[in-house]
Amino acid sequence: MKGRIYCIGVGPGDAELMTLKAVRIIKECDVIAYPIKDEQADTSVAFNIARQAVPDIAAKDLLPIFSPMVRDRNTIQETHERAAKQISSLLDEGLKVAYLTLGDPMIYCTYTSLAKLLSENGYETEYVSGVTSFCAAAARLGIPIADRDETLTILPGVYDVSALKHPGRHVIMKSAGKMHQVKDELRALGKDAMAVENCGMQDEKIYRSISEIPDDAGYFTVILPSGK
């Protein structure tokens, strides 16, 4: 009998934001998989968050999955195919595998492509929702993301700056390396912005105006522009 693969959102950084279901399933799983950026690494941000909520996780069988932060499609495909083979072999043994991911698994999650490969080979994924970084950031700032009949647009960096002109509220994610451009575009539109870097983590930083946001703000920075 085939095992089961779960993709579990561990939230943005604060282990207390992990859901009861996430904690339960992690405890029940035989193998804990998680993405790493460096092939030499043996842990990750997602794993360290989960370990705070489930200390015994380190005693389980661990499977670091190399997931380089690159845009080359061939490299990405090769790493996903290798990971799919590793996970498939475990599922064929009847094991339960938990794949940990930051935030929620249905928002900009690298596992999506891996899940497709597994599905093509007859392995279906069960997803466990987690708190998104932008919801957690809004809570830390004490401001609603959207209210009443406002629309909400989520942008990965500023790949299409014209989207900032759309009516309603906006959330800007993954802007590392483009922060100066993002701020210039917001200023050109007459918008101020708040932001949270590394929300819920030990090195969390809160910026309450666009002038406070540094150009070198990290990858895990969520920007919430003001105005409509």
Language-model segment annotations:
Residues 1-15, 20-123, 211-214, 221-222, ...:
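Class I S-adenosyl-L-methionine
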Residues 5, 36, 164-228:
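A contiguous loop/helix-start segment that scaffolds small-molecule binding in enzyme catalytic cores
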Residues 34, 61-66, 127, 147, ...:
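Structural signal for conserved beta-strand scaffold positions within catalytic alpha/beta enzyme cores
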Residues 39-41, 132-135, 201-203:
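Short gly/pro/ser/thr-enriched loop/turn and capping motifs at secondary-structure boundaries
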Residues 67-73, 160-162, 201-204:
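A short acidic, often aromatic-flanked loop/helix-cap motif at beta-alpha or helix-coil junctions
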Residues 75-83, 140-143, 165-169, 207-212:
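Short, surface-exposed amphipathic charged segments that create phosphate/polyanion-binding patches used
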Residues 86-88, 156-164, 177-181:
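A short, acidic, amphipathic alpha-helical segment used as a generic capping/interface helix at domain edges
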Residues 106-166, 214:
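Class I SAM-dependent methyltransferase SAM-binding "motif I" and its flanking Rossmann-like core
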